[in-house]
Amino acid sequence: MNAEKEHSKNREHKTRILVVDDHDIVRQGLIQLVNQEPDLVVCAEAENAGQALDALEKQQVDLAIVDISLEDTSGLELTEKMKLCYPNLIVLILSMHDSLLYAQRSLRAGAAGYVAKHEAAEKIIVAIHQVRDGKIYVSDSKVAKMPSDATS
């Protein structure tokens, strides 16, 4: 099968997303935002690391959107655990911190992207699509400052 056919075959199903945030209002907003996209669907939500890991055990998830600050652990620690158990899982870190340091730490933990919560909704969707398609995404304000070895 050539690459173009395989790519279109992979896009026949919606990208299944797990939303992890300890604030219900943020989770619900992300769920609404994601479910408006024709190629994306939220298949599970979690308010903490335990619920997130349980969700991953119970169903197929393609991509996880993880808050960097959870009540029971950091989103970075959760990302490391998820990537260890599910190496093909794509992780996008969502953070209230607009910080180069946190962006670098997120990528080192195994995340494919880092987006600040203050970004416009459209930017969050762009970030989801980019990481889903195998690219790295970092909030615009961080890109210019990101060293080329940020994931090393």
Where on the chain are the PLM-derived regions?
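The feature encodes the CheY-like receiver
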Residues: 26, 71, 95
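Acidic, metal-coordinating helix/loop segments flanking the phosphotransfer/catalytic sites
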Residues: 45-63
